[in-house]
């Protein structure tokens, strides 16, 4: 998706919406990660709040189901002292045929300050960002196959937390890359942050043809893909988005690309294992790996709150 200018930034180059990790500079990505680092300690305080968004209204608009993302956004906004409104899409006027922009216009009339949007159509958050008032901000919580920038950012935070520096890292992204908005967000962020090597690993039917053009190495066997890797990011099979016979079966996929403790030994001894969730144990990853010492899957969730606090506080502090 190409744009004449980056709609995420104002004329001063400041972040006013978070729509994608693509097109964001290393300086902006680092600003978000550094700000998140300052928020991590909030979760361990007796009073888990800071007043940065006091008096602001944050509307969570999830047109697709979500547990972790919606909950962590709600927690993040609450810890910033915002008023949080969760729209019940199934019972809203949108379910009765109201257009997306009419829904946004009506909610804007209720003095919304920030929209967190998850939508099945790629580009929906961009459309909203182009039609809101200058003081209103949009954060993409996942749009179609296109992008999931806050997941990408929390993945970057997790990697930086455990590995410190990106410049010598080999990161392998394994699984259903074709349907994964997380993979795209991770790739854009990793390359911008100077990761030494990014590998995309999966069967040919689940790896987009344009991956090599994104500056990554494509591997069609798990063994090649994770050998010597510092970071392994596992992705589930998104059966709900698949059309046609892309795989013989999930069992065959698991046999070839499922991460087991034995296969994990091909990676570096201090490699970390990540997963954006939801996890399908026994398919893309064995329980022994999920619950093992190299797994940082639960810390990812914890860091996600701080990262989303950082994103909302930064965009809300800048004017279009």
UniProtKB/Swiss-Prot annotation:
A GO biological process of this protein is:
'de novo' UMP biosynthetic process
- Which residues participate in L-aspartate binding? 96, 181, 236
Gene3D superfamilies linked: Aspartate/ornithine carbamoyltransferase (3.40.50.1370)
Q: What pathway or pathways are given for this protein in its record?
A: Pyrimidine metabolism; UMP biosynthesis via de novo pathway; (S)-dihydroorotate from bicarbonate: step 2/3
Q: Which reaction does it catalyse?
A: carbamoyl phosphate + L-aspartate = N-carbamoyl-L-aspartate + phosphate + H(+)
CC annotations in GO: cytosol
Name the Enzyme Commission number(s) assigned to this protein. Answer: 2.1.3.2
Domain of life the protein comes from = Bacteria
Q: Which family does it belong to?
A: Belongs to the aspartate/ornithine carbamoyltransferase superfamily. ATCase family.
Function of the protein: Catalyzes the condensation of carbamoyl phosphate and aspartate to form carbamoyl aspartate and inorganic phosphate, the committed step in the de novo pyrimidine nucleotide biosynthesis pathway.
Check the record and name the NCBIfam families matching this protein: asp_carb_tr, PRK00856.1
Give the multimer and partner information.
Heterododecamer (2C3:3R2) of six catalytic PyrB chains organized as two trimers (C3), and six regulatory PyrI chains organized as three dimers (R2).
Instruction: Report what the protein is called.
Output: Aspartate carbamoyltransferase catalytic subunit
Native source species: Polaromonas naphthalenivorans (strain CJ2)
Q: Gene name on record?
A: pyrB
């Amino acid at each position: 998706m190409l744009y004449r200018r980056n709609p995420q930034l104002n004329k001063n180059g400041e972040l006013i919406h978070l729509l994608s990790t693509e097109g964001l500079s290393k300086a902006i990505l680092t600003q978000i990660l550094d700000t998140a680092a300052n928020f991590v300690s909030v979760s361990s305080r007796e009073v888990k709040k800071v007043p940065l968004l006091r008096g602001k209204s944050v509307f969570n608009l999830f047109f697709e189901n979500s547990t972790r993302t919606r909950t962590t956004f709600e927690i993040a906004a609450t810890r910033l002292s915002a008023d949080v409104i969760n729209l019940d899409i199934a019972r809203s006027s949108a379910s009765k045929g109201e257009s997306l922009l009419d829904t946004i216009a009506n909610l804007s009339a209720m003095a919304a300050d920030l929209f967190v949007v998850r939508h099945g159509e790629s580009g929906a958050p961009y459309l909203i960002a182009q039609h809101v008032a200058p003081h209103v901000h949009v954060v993409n919580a996942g749009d179609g196959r296109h992008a999931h920038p806050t997941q990408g950012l929390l993945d970057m935070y997790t990697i930086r937390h455990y590995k410190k520096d990106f410049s010598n890292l080999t990161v392998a992204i394994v699984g259903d890359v074709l349907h994964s908005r997380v993979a795209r967000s991770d790739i854009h962020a990793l390359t911008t942050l100077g990761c030494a090597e990014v590998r995309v690993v999966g069967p040919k039917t689940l790896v987009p043809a344009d991956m090599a053009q994104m500056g990554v190495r494509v591997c069609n066997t798990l063994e090649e893909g994770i050998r010597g890797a510092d970071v392994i990011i596992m992705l589930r099979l998104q059966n709900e988005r698949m059309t046609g016979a892309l795989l013989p079966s999930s069992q065959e996929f698991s046999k070839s690309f499922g991460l087991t403790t034995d296969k994990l030994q091909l990676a570096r001894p201090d490699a970390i294992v990540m997963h954006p969730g939801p996890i399908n144990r026994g398919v893309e990853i064995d329980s022994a790996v999920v619950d093992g010492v190299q797994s940082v899957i639960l810390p990812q969730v914890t860091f996600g709150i701080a990262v989303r606090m950082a994103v909302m506080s930064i965009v809300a502090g800048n004017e279009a």
